[in-house]
Amino acid sequence: MDDTQIEHPRPIPIFYCCYLLRSTVRHASLYIGSTPNPARRLIQHNGVVKGGARRTAAEKLRPWEMVLVVEGFMSRLAALQFEWAWQNPWYSRHLRSEESSALAEVKHRRMRKAKSEDPEFLDSNCDSAKSRVKGTPKKSKRRHRPPRSLDTYFSDLHRLLRSTYFSHWPLKIRFFSGDIYQSWKAWYDRVDVRLRSPVKVILDGSCPEISAHAGGNDTRFGGVENAKITYAAIRDYIEKAIFLLDDPKDVRCHVCQGQIVPTEELTTVCPQAECHCTCHLLCLSRKFVDAALEPNQIVPKHGICPACEATIEWPLMMKELSFRSRAKQELLEILKRKRRVDRKQGAVTGEVESSSRRTVSVDLDDRFGQHAEDEFLLDEDWWEGLAAESDSDTDLRLKPLSKAAPKLETVIEDSECDDADIL
């Protein structure tokens, strides 16, 4: 038997975003990337630690600032898709307007008609093709993309967010720069076409606090340097789900009223602290989709809990479910500790509950790196594979749980393929 390590599916990233960088020296210089850790990625771009992108390495443009992020991606691949489309609006199928498609079709029809009606046209094209074959092979030239202004970036972002593909994703825009937000607001007020569904805007960093833009789960980081998001953010939610499903005797689906077997079925748990609602994944998703009344919707964005009637976000439940179903080793250690405590103190019910809760909390704190967030984000075992940078473009493999992965030491090639707008 070989020693090849089998990689299992990772939990859904607790946070992944596409970001827009701006040079503080030359505001016209902009850069697009994606990352699960904005705080770390920014200091890499600024050369504080190794691992930055080549196109942001010019000292004359440093320091860079992260002015806005688009967050809410459920996987690294999803963020990469959005990042590439934002970087390459000329080639992205998501930004091809119906008008340009119609013009291309008309041009194609005219070409076919000219070929069919004029034989000389066809012969001349054949001769030119032969001459190209016989001649010196044409050297491929590197495509130089036209520089884009800030308004152009806004326009491309706006078109992406209202495209058929991305408009159904639970995406949010978080602004860290007050003047960039004001520029966006002034630009958006001039646009005739609105987004298909309201995209939540979160004002952070130097932006003024406006309660209308704040949501229950959309906390302000206070700045990019504080944007270090780990699974510790939903620790209590994960603990509650583990306790509810550890003894499945009385676990029933609140939608179909059927018995739930957590070890065999994907089970959702309400994130509200006082609610013990459990449902089959398919039952709850069908209920949410039916209530949304959107014909093209397949995956729900949010819905009303059938027990407590609170509005709950579907992505949040999926993050907890993916951790519970995919981080098997962590859960086994937590449950083993809990059951040992239950056996030792089974005579005193109240003490059992309190001690188990405290033990699990300590264990989760260790796993989530509550007291060492930087080490957790950079080096923690299974998470590092999940938190690989899109623009780092290096496949970081999982290490044994007892060892820490080495820190990034190489300068990383651009995920943008050298298309940062350096003016």
From Swiss-Prot:
InterPro entries: GIY-YIG_endonuc, GIY-YIG_endonuc_sf, Slx1, SLX1_C, SLX1_endonuclease, Znf_RING/FYVE/PHD. Residues 131-147 have a biased composition (Basic residues). CDD domains: GIY-YIG_SLX1. One of its GO terms (cellular component) is Slx1-Slx4 complex. Its cofactor is a divalent metal cation. GO terms for molecular function: 5'-flap endonuclease activity; crossover junction DNA endonuclease activity; zinc ion binding. Its main location: nucleus. Keywords: DNA damage, DNA recombination, DNA repair, Endonuclease, Hydrolase, Metal-binding, Nuclease, Nucleus, Zinc, Zinc-finger. It comes from the Eukaryota. Gene3D superfamilies: GIY-YIG endonuclease, Zinc/RING finger domain, C3HC4 (zinc finger). Residues 14-96 form the GIY-YIG domain. GO terms for biological process: double-strand break repair via homologous recombination. SUPFAM superfamilies: GIY-YIG endonuclease (SSF82771). It is found in: Nucleus. Residues 114-147 are annotated as: Disordered. Pfam families: GIY-YIG, SLX1_C. Its EC number is 3.1.-.-. Belongs to the SLX1 family. Forms a heterodimer with slx4. Catalytic subunit of the slx1-slx4 structure-specific endonuclease that resolves DNA secondary structures generated during DNA repair and recombination. Has endonuclease activity towards branched DNA substrates, introducing single-strand cuts in duplex DNA close to junctions with ss-DNA. This is Structure-specific endonuclease subunit slx1.
